[in-house]
């Protein structure tokens, strides 16, 4: 081979080697390990602030037990609501739960925003159950106590509590102090056991059930008759009924607003069915009444704000002095509270003693 061709051949080999080197990938170092990012916790949503108690968005619940006609309670309750709202600037909501037990349970379930007009038995149970606290008690015609009464047909031969043995008993609700608990204790003390028991739904309904012949006797609240002229209560524990010589004169007033017998106005549960049964006094008599019972209460939920409670208490005292009170809770067809006065928890120890003696509990009134 000539030198010229040898040079060309070597040059081609060098160029080929360079080309091959260019095609070979360069060595690379292993990638460094990377740490996975820490998971991030999303920020918690900001809680919506609770509306103030007593605001339109969070009204104060005013609870009434369904012891009389619910329509009357709602109508009168709305009058009270309007008066309280005007006096305090707070917002209220009237409610009539379906039973005494439901009223107690609502106060315990809503401890910060409920106030309830509940009887002594309901208060005794609610205070033990969750700390419901009494503020006021009813005054009726000058009395801070009231009574249970046992009604029987006027033409019956029933002469004493012992004669009720085995007879059909009508009562409003097992949560009622005067309608059920106190009569139950009276029967136990007398050593008698009534027969069939009929829960009628309220005092009015019990008086009506007796009038209709659906039960043999009924137990309801008792308030003494009042003098037509003076308005004063006429009370004799040994003779609580309208005197026999006045019974035939008992009649509705021209406006159907009352039953009057001579100069006495009937104030017990019979008067509440006067329009449906205007001759109820001629058909039903009072067999006997109970010992004194502490009057019904206005109580507050256990965590009700003290400042709001004080405003409401002041407003209620002022409301009780107005004519509108008589159209509200002071109406004969409502709870017949003619006034209010301060109450203490200890006043209801008498009821607690009865509860303990009978083994009664909230379960018994559900």
Predicted segment positions?
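An extracytoplasmic/periplasmic, membrane-proximal ligand-sensing/linker region
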Residues: 36, 49-82, 229, 238-250, ...
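Bacterial N-terminal signal peptides that target proteins for export
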Residues: 1-10
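Acidic, polar ligand-binding/catalytic clefts
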Residues: 105-163, 174-177
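Pocket-lining segment of extracytoplasmic ligand-binding domains
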Residues: 168-170, 175-305
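Extracytoplasmic/secreted proteins, especially bacterial periplasmic and envelope-associated proteins
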Residues: 72-79, 83, 102, 106, ...
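Short helix-initiation/N-cap motifs at beta->coil->alpha
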Residues: 94-109, 119, 194-208, 227
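Bilobed "Venus flytrap"/periplasmic-binding protein-like clamshell domains
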Residues: 57, 62-87, 144-215, 223-227, ...
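Ser/Thr-rich, Proline-interspersed low-complexity disordered segments
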Residues: 15, 22-55
């Amino acid at each position: 081979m000539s030198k010229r061709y040898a040079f060309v051949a070597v040059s081609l080999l060098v160029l080929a080697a360079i080309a091959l080197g260019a095609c070979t990938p360069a060595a690379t170092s292993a990638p460094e390990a990377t740490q996975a990012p820490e998971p991030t916790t999303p920020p918690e949503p900001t809680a919506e602030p609770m509306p103030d108690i007593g605001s339109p968005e969070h009204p104060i619940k005013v609870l009434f037990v369904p012891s009389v006609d619910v329509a009357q309670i709602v109508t009168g309750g709305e009058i009270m609501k309007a008066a309280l709202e005007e006096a305090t600037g707070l917002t209220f909501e009237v409610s009539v739960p379906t039973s005494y037990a439901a009223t107690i349970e609502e106060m315990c379930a809503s401890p910060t925003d409920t106030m309830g007009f509940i009887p002594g038995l309901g208060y005794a149970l609610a205070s033990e159950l969750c700390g419901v606290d009494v503020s006021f008690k009813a005054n009726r015609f000058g009395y801070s106590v009231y009574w249970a009464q046992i009604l029987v047909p006027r033409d019956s031969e029933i002469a004493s509590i012992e004669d009720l043995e085995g007879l059909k008993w009508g009562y409003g609700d097992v949560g009622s102090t005067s309608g059920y608990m106190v009569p139950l204790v009276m029967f136990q003390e007398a050593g008698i056991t009534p027969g069939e028991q009929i829960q009628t739904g309220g005092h009015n309904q019990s008086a009506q059930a007796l009038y209709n012949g659906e039960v043999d006797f009924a137990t309801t609240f008792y308030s003494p008759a009042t003098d037509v002229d003076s308005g004063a209560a006429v009370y004799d524990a040994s003779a609580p009924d309208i005197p026999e010589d006045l019974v035939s004169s008992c009649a509705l007033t021209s406006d159907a607003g009352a039953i009057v017998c001579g100069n006495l106005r009937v104030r017990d549960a019979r008067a509440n069915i006067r329009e449906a049964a205007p001759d109820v006094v001629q058909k039903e008599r009072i067999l006997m009444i109970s010992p004194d019972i502490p009057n019904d209460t206005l109580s507050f939920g256990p965590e009700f704000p003290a400042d709001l409670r004080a405003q409401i208490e002041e407003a209620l005292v002022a409301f009780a002095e107005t004519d509108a009170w008589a159209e509200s809770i002071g109406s004969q067809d409502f709870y017949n509270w003619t006034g209010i006065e301060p109450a203490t928890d200890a006043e209801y120890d008498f009821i607690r003693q009865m509860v303990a003696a009978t083994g009664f509990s909230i379960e018994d009134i559900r």
